[in-house]
């Protein structure tokens, strides 16, 4: 059985692109998050209705972060107007490898040009590694702080990317920040490897 829903005149003039990864039980999760759980409470065979119970952290799969996720006293998702999620979109390709950093210079030189009011998607290529893996989370590229300043100064509407977060993993709880600071990070082995890489690079520069 298949269903179709007709589009109105306004929607029929637009192109829609689904950028979401599949979501459900077993979706890749941050190292300290519980798995998504989907339970069937009623099924067609027994109850003639389908009722499901979903237990999840909202910060899972392809999602939007509200400012309140990281900055105290800022808006939650329900406090942001719907108009903030619609507008002109631009996808820029800025390939990065393991622990790469997206900088303001990268954004300034990106094509097509990023304009004020754009919703910007930065494609680092890391979506190809999306999985329940140490590589996707621990070795991910991230944005340098000057990139955030560049976005703000440019006046973009929203920013999306294909990495585990906008932040570099070594600026998250994977490293000694936040909930796992006293443990040396959620993934201390990754922190040790990163520190060794920095030490080796510094020694090579001398």
Please give the residue ranges for each predicted region:
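Generic N-terminal segment detector
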Residues: 1-47, 157
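Divalent metal-coordination and catalytic microenvironments
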Residues: 19, 63, 92, 120, ...
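Histidine-centered catalytic micro-motifs
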Residues: 54-71, 161-166
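A glycine-rich, hydrophobic loop/mini-helix early in the fold
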Residues: 64-102
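Glycine- and Gly-Pro-enriched alpha-helical subdomains that act as flexible
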Residues: 93-133
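Histidine/acidic-residue-rich catalytic or RNA/ligand-binding cores of hydrolases
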Residues: 169-186, 191
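Conserved small/polar residues in nucleotide/adenosyl-binding loops
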Residues: 199-204
């Amino acid at each position: 059985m298949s269903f179709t829903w007709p589009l109105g005149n306004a929607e029929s003039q637009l192109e829609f692109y689904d950028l979401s990864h599949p979501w459900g039980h077993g979706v890749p999760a941050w190292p300290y998050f519980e798995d998504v759980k989907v339970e069937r409470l009623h099924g067609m065979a027994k109850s003639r209705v389908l009722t499901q119970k979903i237990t999840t952290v909202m910060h899972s799969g392809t999602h939007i972060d509200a400012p309140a996720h990281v900055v105290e006293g800022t808006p939650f998702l329900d406090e942001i107007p719907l108009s903030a999620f619609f507008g002109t979109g631009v996808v820029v390709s800025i390939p990065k490898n393991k622990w790469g950093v997206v900088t303001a210079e990268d954004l300034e030189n990106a094509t097509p040009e990023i304009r004020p009011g754009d919703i910007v998607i930065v494609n680092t290529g890391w979506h190809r590694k999306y999985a329940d893996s140490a590589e996707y989370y621990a070795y991910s590229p991230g944005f340098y702080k000057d990139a955030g300043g560049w976005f703000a100064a440019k006046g973009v509407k929203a920013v999306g990317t294909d990495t585990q977060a906008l932040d570099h993993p070594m600026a998250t709880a994977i490293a000694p920040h936040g909930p796992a600071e006293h443990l040396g990070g959620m993934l201390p082995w990754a922190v040790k490897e990163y520190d060794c890489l920095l030490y080796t690079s510094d020694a090579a520069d001398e």
